[in-house]
Amino acid sequence: MKAWEIWTWQGHPCVLVSNQRRLDRKERVVVLKCQTLYAGDPLPRENEALLDEADGLDRRTVCACDLLYTAPKKDLKQRRGVVTFDRRRDISRKIIQGLAIAGL
């Protein structure tokens, strides 16, 4: 497993956002949970990132960047793709803005 890969977790795509050292050594990793978009679904909000075929996914997919999950590596199934470089920067910025830790 590598940082920024997209895997399936609990039936949905998720992005691995833990640093590589944690991914290599720990049993639980930090992920962003994502949701596939369908016709009629609302457009992504300012705290969400949009992924698509360029990232290896079959359909447009939205990832909430203001809520981090801890997932057991053993529960991550089927590597689906890798987030593009420009989208990594967008996701990183949205994580920082979305968490706004203690107003900092």
What are these regions (language model features)?
Residues 1-104:
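Conserved functional hotspots at enzyme active or ligand-binding sites that engage polyanionic ligands
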